[in-house]
A protein has these predicted regions:
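C-terminal beta-strand-rich structural cap/linker in extracellular carbohydrate-active enzymes
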Residues: 93-112
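Proline-centered linker/hinge motifs at extracellular inter-domain junctions
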Residues: 10, 110-116
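Solvent-exposed beta-strand/loop surfaces of large extracellular or lumenal domains
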Residues: 74-90
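Short, solvent-exposed loop/edge segments of extracellular or virion-exposed proteins
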Residues: 117-123
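Short edge beta-strand/loop segments characteristic of extracellular beta-sandwich folds
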Residues: 20-22, 55-61, 131-139
Length: 150
């Protein structure tokens, strides 16, 4: 347990993760439990409200380049399922600013997005069409951006 004064900034370092808490991130002074164990970063409970987000950095140096490009931070929910946390990569870290405390892990996006054409049937001629409708979905990490070319 660590005492976190709301008027102070903190940096916690673990073998595979770092946590940065800015000044005034909490509404009041708190005792929080924070640790890393078996590749899981535990930052207390989701029930503690935050005034500002905190930054978590998780080390991905143990992965080779082809896997490192597909890593993201997953937040473990009450149902033990992980949900995607928006993040960016810098050097050997995946970095996210989170607005909720909880448990975080490195996940690897192993499922390709699904791209399907809407309102066109097989062997249908499309050269006279002005618009094409396409549905893009991804059940794992989501689709951040896309580009279509014909």
């Amino acid at each position: 347990m660590f005492k976190v004064n709301k008027d102070s900034a903190y940096n916690f370092k673990f073998p595979g993760a770092k946590v940065s808490i800015e000044k005034n991130s909490f509404y009041t002074d708190k005792m929080i439990q924070i640790f890393e164990e078996n590749n899981l970063l535990h930052v207390d409970k989701d029930s503690i409200p935050l005034l500002k987000g905190i930054t978590i950095k998780m080390d991905i140096s143990r992965y080779n380049d082809s896997i490192r490009n597909r890593t993201y931070i997953g937040r473990i929910g009450e149902n033990k399922k992980s949900s995607f946390v928006s993040s960016k990569k810098e050097e050997n870290y995946v970095i996210a600013k989170v607005n909720n405390l909880g448990d975080f892990v490195i996940k690897i996006d192993s499922i390709k997005p699904n791209v399907s054409v809407i309102d066109i049937s097989d062997n249908q001629w499309i050269s006279n069409r002005k618009n094409l409708s396409i549905k893009i979905s991804d059940n794992e990490s989501g689709v951040k951006n896309y580009r279509g070319t014909i």
